[in-house]
Amino acid sequence: MVRSRTKKNRLEIGGSSVCRKSPVDCWTFLKYHGKIERKAVEGMLKQGTENRSQMEFFCIDQFVPKKHLLRKIDKAVNFDHIYEMVEELYSPDNGRPSCDPVVLFKMVIIQHLYGIPSLRRTVEEIDMNVAYRWFLGYTMSDKLPHFATISYNFLHRFTEQTIEEVFHWVLDEIAAHHMLSPEAVFIDGTHIKASANMKKRIKREIPVAAKKYEELLMEEINEDRENHGKKQFTDDKNDTSKTKNVTESTTDPDCGVFNKGEHKKQFAYEAHTACDKNGYIMDVEVTPGNVHDSVAFEEYYDRLTESFPQIEYVVMDAGYKTPAVAKKVIDSGRIPVLPYKRTNGKEGCFKPYDYVYDEYYDCVICPNNEVLKYSTTNREGYKEYKSCPKICEKCPELAKCTQSRNHQKTVLKHIWSDYMEQTEDIRHTTGMRELYDKRKETIERCFADAKEKHGMRYTLVRGLSQVTKWVRLKFAAMNIKKYALHTA
């Protein structure tokens, strides 16, 4: 018999009082007193499986929510333009019937929109998802293309040029609706982990790749040396004697080693990306992970400005703050927006800005008001100004100035340093700080969304060409998503 408890802890069921807190006692009470049968309780709680084989007639459109993302994309974008881009890749009068190229592109867009890691998994998800089938124009009984068919087409049929055309077509659609704002462009790079094991690697000696601006730089170096009465450098353009040792993956030779943190390394690619103030990705250049931002900048910048000549401001982080990048942007008639970059040097020593350059006499004045005279211009484009050791060894500030054995201080000044000074003047101009601060909500947000929501943290494809196509398709899908949400 159930013990009596306070009223608030008891429950009246069928005229009988049971305890609220003790399900075991409650069930025992009900079971032995016959107030509620066990089958009746199961009938209230259990969902049967009798309907699994039941046949129904329904309309797929009714099962896709009105506010579903794919509905918005289908309304905003006309994918029939893809037929024109791939028309030359198909033969109209021979061969077996092919899969619809628009369906293939839509399936890959679904993969990138929802961050599905593989094409095999993508086909499985589409096979069971009503909204995905509705987006493709397939009924629930229609057979989907095999995942190998999609893979083969994007590996062999659709080239980098085809994917680039699709990417720019999406941008043209956005620009046609006045949603693209290319006046200020935000540039940065992000690393993508490659499908390669760090243990499968070899050491290789390769020739040092010449930078695009080296020829122009050498001309100005020789001109400066000639003005100072020095001999010109005679460099052979075909000289391949300069080499460097690199770590190469045997799995994916196109990727490069990226130092992730102080002790961790990984094979990776880097996506050098540009976007506008609304977060629409305007262009991307994929390089191995060991290529510095400033090295990949020139070719990528030329292509970007050719596509969008209305660019006025180029916003970049400290990785792009080099004389070559500053010269490239300023000479093109645009304004580089760069941050403050802390100077290198030992603590307690004089900073580079403590040494004042006298343009009229072409010399440098040290903090102790002594003159450092011009010595030479080296092959890297730096003019060297050196002090007199006899004067320096008696200087009371020698310890703060230099630790060289011969007590001689050398100050380096790049022949394009005037462009760096212009970037500092621009940095202090009204409105530039606010413009630079928008990086976190534009380009950094693009990278965060791509990695967290769209599966760009690592890639399963291999080779620079395939990774480039993979990244462009992912960014095209992100642009389509943003465009559809803005026009909804």
Each PLM stretch: what is its role?
Residues 36-71:
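Hydrophobic alpha-helical membrane-insertion signals
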Residues 66-109, 114-115:
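Basic, short loop/linker segments at the boundary and entry of helix-turn-helix/winged-helix-like folds
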Residues 41, 46-49, 108, 115-128, ...:
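Anion-binding and metal-coordination hotspots
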Residues 133-137:
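Short arginine-rich
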Residues 7-9, 13, 21-22, 31:
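Polybasic, lysine-rich low-complexity intrinsically disordered segments
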